[in-house]
């Protein structure tokens, strides 16, 4: 998409910020085709973790705050293996995805805090142009203890679980951290679903099945 929009329009970036009362970050998992590691860390991840320091002005303070916020939090990016590169932090994962006779073009971000889960589906890659300049389309799916599009959220989680089988990386450390985050997320979602009032029985049963699969 070649048309540009003003750099002041950062609605897609702002979707990475936690809403009021979201709680502590659990982790984030996102997919993209092209990828800018510096942009992801300094713009997307910084918003998700609510990092106040600026990397270009407060270098040491930024690094210390990032390490402190990332400590218990998982962050991973699934990137088409042709675009993955090697420029990334050791504190979060870049997972190259290899799809036979195809490319990894999905742009889906799963952002999880202790009291809130958000799915962001967009047409924009994780780059400066994809998030700040191009005309892109985006939508969000929210889950709290009071409201959620449970079926859509379940399908999104299922997609991310399925993509794990396409990752070119076979290193057990990455797979273990990836699956650990999905299990933790499933625990959080299932607790919210079972505690929510007025949800249809089939929704509760659906998330119980998702939760059981994630623990396998």
Feature-to-residue mapping (PLM):
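PLD/PLD-like phosphodiesterase catalytic module centered on the HKD motif
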Residues: 1-216
